[in-house]
Regions:
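C-terminal (or distal) subdomains of carbohydrate-active enzymes
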Residues: 117-120, 136, 154-155, 167-179, ...
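N-terminal catalytic cores of secreted or lumenal carbohydrate-active enzymes
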Residues: 1-81, 85, 94, 123, ...
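Catalytic domains of cell-wall/extracellular-matrix polysaccharide-remodeling enzymes
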Residues: 98-138, 193, 226
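C-terminal domain-boundary segment and adjacent tail
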Residues: 34-38, 122, 131-146, 202-282, ...
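Acidic, His- and aromatic-enriched active-site or binding-groove loops in soluble protein domains
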Residues: 49-68, 118-138, 142-151
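Terminal accessory/targeting
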Residues: 1-28, 167-169, 178, 186, ...
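Alpha-helical scaffold elements lining the catalytic groove of polysaccharide deacetylases
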Residues: 75-96, 158-171, 194-204
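Metal- or metallocofactor-binding catalytic centers and their adjacent structured scaffolds
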Residues: 25, 258-375, 720
Length: 816
């Protein structure tokens, strides 16, 4: 309640919109479109009585479900599998419910678009996408990373205009008669509607073959007098003929463009494979949205693989629901943080619920193959390549230290923590086979914890110089010095002025303050087979409580730099107490280069991008960062300098330093406070005040990123091994992938329930033929598109399926 007014879910507006649409459709000529399957599905769950009418309208060409998928999601911060699954699930659901497969792609209001979107669109049957936001292809055809091409927007021989004077962004204020409680005047809805009537029509013929007149906008209800307005215009306007329509009606006029979509003239192809950057603040604001979403995605992926392989896909329906729910977390006003506090809390609850369910499904599948054993655990590897990673296990009892073995092999043990009742043991897993499992045994041992007094540390292949205020130099065996402190110390916190809103930075003032002078080395210690360097610091304002600093209230931090035997990366754990306004916090990872070109992992691919500076101060202007998923870094002549992240996707490569943005504190409530419609001060959470913890790692891969293990290691860093109490009791089904640079995206039951689907992605831009070994009971294998329509039978070589992988291709294999 706000001054006697009432707030309701946005779903109430969606329901009113669809109710009104269906009422106007009864005139026999009205047409309408819905952007996303999510909206329509939830409406039909509440109103199944309208399903037949909607199906009839769709088949009559009067209703079109557009091809954004389940939701219009952000496609820069999500796993490639979610980018694909969003469109797959929305398209198949639309076809099932409406009897018509959606064919018009849609990404309206999405904040940028990724380089593998054209391939995903084409694999789902879409050749045309008339809406992309807010950065666009610079030519009519958009060709993606793999060469797949789609037609963008409406060709020049058409004119597109708004046919309504209604504000596209005006919210629905409370009904003035009842202040939101519902009455006869507002049809018991509680709000004063904003409707899109046809009150701004074009009146004269132009050179265009057709004029597309849009009647839509955010939170705008359908007009009630559109059909009457069309009839009146046709009766009085001799130059133009008006009619209701949907995008499908334009396909006959697009025949020429669509006929050449696979081989358009070179001058008509956009010069860029992605439509970024834009709305850069969205990659940092409310950072927990990104962190928790990343964690949840990987949990669902692991659960799906093991439920399919070990539990015969028994939970396929539940997992499909989890994927659909994840598309809501990935929605372009959800993961992007462009929402109010209540919405943020709802999203955190949603992700927590998905994590809980996925964890239970994962445990249920894996425990089918283990026996109870108090001092043993089994490590399951859902990746298709051998994997080792730090693992933490809880054992009963109060252990001072621990010994961990895999067979006769002793494993590195890093830390043993206890509270008198249970002990947490962290150790390095052995190399667990891809899609396999290994049992390890734990037993008590003496504690191994000693302080280290030398400030030059050599451990796990790294040599580190620990200065009083930060790490000044890092060298690696066979590569030499890979970090220097010319501009920043390694992992240093950098405070940067960032005046703006959740969407982005709105000024050119990006002044920085280094935090190394306020940082102090607090200790170095050897914890078992690891070495931990500890630093802590605080901003000077913390010690001046009675001084006035309008922008920094309180800021402190601790950092642990962890070297682990058997683990190829240097971990950086940063905890920040953040109470600022109009600032951005970056972590600096300086290399030994002066590079301004970076390498960035994107959903289902990798791009090399150049440094750029801020492009403006308008809403959505880019501020100098690029989006990445698991890692970004610098390719040197001899090695890849990569910085892994766990849900902090905003990077900038500047004069040889990889800068990772981890926090923002925007103050401007753009689009979140709209007094003309309502007053609700429920947006202060956008400043992210509180304590935050971030996990990063430095990885050095010899040679080129296309050939070394950087992509695989970053995947392990984000989602390692599944730990299940007990010893392996039976062998796992034999699944094996032999590939140089092709990764497994998922293994899942087919959507139609007939067989198993394996999705692979080539991640280096180098074609190869991979070998896929499956259980002997599975005898049929064909490639398929993303919608799982069969394409080409696969050749066998002995026990292996031979799967051709084109450069950057996503290949789906159906096996039965």
């Amino acid at each position: 309640m706000d001054r006697g007014r009432r707030f309701v879910s946005y779903r109430a507006i969606e329901e009113a919109w669809l109710d009104d649409i269906l009422a106007t459709m009864e005139d026999g000529v009205g047409c309408f479109m819905v952007e996303a399957a999510w909206v329509l599905r939830h409406y039909l769950e509440r109103h199944p009585e309208h399903a037949n009418a909607l199906r009839g309208y769709a088949q009559a060409g009067r209703f079109e479900l557009l091809g954004s998928g389940e939701n219009i999601i952000d496609v820069n911060m999500v796993h490639g599998e979610l980018m694909a699954r969003n469109l797959i699930l929305g398209t198949l659901w639309g076809e099932h419910v409406l009897g018509v497969r959606p064919t018009t792609g849609w990404h309206g209001d999405g904040f940028g678009s990724s380089a593998q979107m054209p391939q995903v669109l084409r694999e789902c049957g879409y050749q045309w996408i008339p809406a992309i936001s807010y950065s666009h292809p610079d030519a009519p055809y958009w060709r993606g990373l793999d060469g797949a091409t789609v037609l963008f927007n409406i060709p020049e021989r058409f004119t597109e205009t708004s046919g309504s004077h209604a504000s596209c962004f005006r919210k629905h204020p409370p009904c003035p008669a009842c202040q939101g409680h519902g009455c006869a005047i507002c049809q018991d809805r509680g709000f004063d509607p904003n409707r899109a009537e046809l009150d701004n029509p074009p009146m004269a013929r132009t050179a265009a073959a057709a004029i597309v007149c849009g009647l839509w906008g955010e939170e705008i209800l359908p007009g009630e007098r559109v059909t009457a307005a069309i009839a009146a215009l046709n009766a009085t306007n001799g130059e133009l003929h008006f009619r209701h329509g949907v995008y499908r009606d334009l396909y006959p006029f697009l025949a020429q463009e669509l006929a050449q979509v696979d081989a358009p003239p070179a001058e008509l192809v956009s010069s860029r494979v992605e439509n970024n950057p834009t709305q850069c603040g969205c990659w940092v604001s409310r950072i927990r949205c990104k962190q928790e979403h990343r964690k949840t995605e990987h949990l669902v992926l692991a659960a799906e693989v093991w439920d399919t392989l070990l539990n015969a896909g028994a939970q396929a329906d539940t997992l499909r629901t989890l994927w659909k729910t994840l598309t809501f977390s990935a929605f372009h006003d959800a993961i992007t943080a462009t929402h109010i506090d209540a919405a943020h809390e709802e999203l955190m609850d949603l992700l927590g619920a998905v994590q809980h369910t996925a964890t239970q499904l994962l445990s249920d599948a894996c425990t089918r193959h283990v026996d109870h054993a108090i001092t043993s655990v089994t490590l399951f590897n859902h990746h298709a390549f051998p994997s080792s990673a730090p693992v933490t296990v809880t054992v009963p009892g109060d252990w001072a230290g621990a010994r961990v073995t895999a067979g006769d092999m002793a494993l590195p043990v890093f830390e043993t923590l206890n509270d008198g009742e249970v002990t947490l043991v962290t150790f390095a897993a052995p190399s667990v086979p891809g899609l396999g499992a290994t049992t390890v045994t734990l037993s008590p041992a003496p504690a191994r914890q000693t302080p280290v007094h030398d400030h030059t540390i050599t451990h796990a292949g790294y040599t580190i110089d620990a200065g009083e205020h930060g790490i000044t130099r890092i060298a690696v065996e066979e590569l030499g010095a890979v970090v220097d402190g010319r501009d920043f110390l390694f992992g240093e916190l950098v405070l940067e002025v960032d005046e703006g809103d959740p969407w982005g930075t709105r000024t050119y003032n990006h002044d920085r303050e280094r935090c190394a002078p306020f940082t102090t080395l607090t200790g170095i210690e050897a914890l078992g087979d690891s070495v931990v360097l500890r630093y802590a610091g605080a901003h000077p304002v913390n010690f001046q409580p009675f001084s006035l600093n309008a922008k920094i209230t309180y800021l402190d931090w601790t950092q642990n730099f962890i070297l682990r035997t058997g683990i190829p990366w240097l971990e950086v754990e940063t905890t920040v107490g953040w109470y600022t306004q109009d600032y951005r916090l970056r972590l600096a990872f300086p290399s030994a280069t002066r590079a301004n070109r970076g390498v960035y992992e994107i959903p289902y691919g990798v791009l090399e991008r150049d440094r750029y500076e801020a492009t403006g101060t308008h809403l959505g202007a880019a501020n100098g960062d690029w989006p990445a998923i698991h890692w970004a870094g610098i390719q040197t002549p001899g090695y890849t300098f990569a910085v892994f992240n766990q849900g902090t996707p905003s990077y900038r490569v500047e004069d040889g330093t990889v800068l990772v943005s981890v926090l923002r504190s925007p103050v401007a409530p753009c689009c979140l406070l709209e007094p003309a419609s309502y007053v609700a001060h429920n947006y202060y959470g956008m400043m992210d005040n509180g304590t935050h913890t971030f996990h990063h790692a430095l990885y050095l891969g010899a040679g080129d990123w296309r050939d070394n293990a950087v992509v695989r290691q970053a995947a392990i860093f984000n989602c390692g091994l599944t730990v299940v109490p007990g010893a392996l009791s039976s062998s796992l089904p034999e699944w094996k992938l032999q590939a140089a640079h092709t990764l497994l995206s998922t293994i899942k039951p087919a959507e139609d329930g007939r067989g198993i689907v394996v999705r692979l992605v080539e991640h280096a831009g180098r074609p190869e033929i991979v070998r896929l070994r499956v259980p002997a009971t599975l005898t049929s294998a064909v490639t398929a598109n993303l919608l799982e329509d069969p394409l080409v039978p696969l050749t066998r070589d002995g026990d292996d399926l031979l799967v051709p992988m084109g450069a950057w291709k996503i290949v789906t294999v159906r096996i039965a």
